[in-house]
Amino acid sequence: MKLPNEIEEYLVSRNFSENTRSNYYYDLVYLQAFFEDKSVTEEALELYKHQLSKLSPAAQRRKISSANQYFLFLYENKKINQFFKIKQVVQKKTQSSESYHPMIKEFPEFYGPLSCPGQFLALLILEFGLNFAEIQKLKWENFNWNFKYLTIEKAGIKRVLPIREKFAIRVKAIKNADELFAKSRQFLYTELKKFTNYSSKEIREQYILHQVKAGKTIYELANLLGLSTITTLEKYYR
């Protein structure tokens, strides 16, 4: 069975940012080129995986993840009559000096009754992975409480982030959020510090860790965070 070229259709069907779309595009063009003169078989998939072994482990995992999502799309849309999946590369254990595995925290204290601006800021960072610069650009109208999503625009790219109910029930009654969003970075820093000893960077990292644990690919996570590259996220996928 030949591999049909449905790359454009696949990308159109996904709500990717321009950068994420570009990453998927090049991964899939690489896949398509390999199968140009080959049939899709389990043996051919093993050959493809072997070819990827020349790349870094992180690059191998990204290309395999992209290929597997594409195969699923083709199968679900009846473009191929058999579902194929490439087995992910085994993540080799590295020395402790090279590995990076911070502990995931739940922060139950963040989800008590809303008591101060610092708590609201902590929730924004933990729930959406926002930094102070992004919080300063927020408007209360960006929160759609009916359909539970937050719209953020950065560098001309819109991100639509889901709002969890445990966040909504604690903050949607706020009346003066725009006043907080208009404050200086120093003000936001001070208010957060009044509420918790954790820095905005530490809380944002917890958002990243929870998304990795939930199974988000490195490209999907970069899209959620509005990042133009995946470089800063690679350490979480080693």
From Swiss-Prot:
Residues 90-238 form the Tyr recombinase domain. Belongs to the 'phage' integrase family. XerD-like subfamily. It comes from Lactococcus lactis subsp. cremoris (strain MG1363). NCBIfam families: PRK02436.1 (NF002685). The keyword Manganese does not apply. It comes from the Bacteria. InterPro entries: CB, DNA_brk_join_enz, Integrase-like_cat_sf, Integrase_catalytic, Integrase_recombinase_N, Tyrosine_recombinase_XerD-like. Keywords: Cytoplasm, DNA integration, DNA recombination, DNA-binding. GO terms for biological process: DNA transposition. This is Tyrosine recombinase XerD-like. The active site is at K154, R204, Y236 (o-(3'-phospho-dna)-tyrosine intermediate).
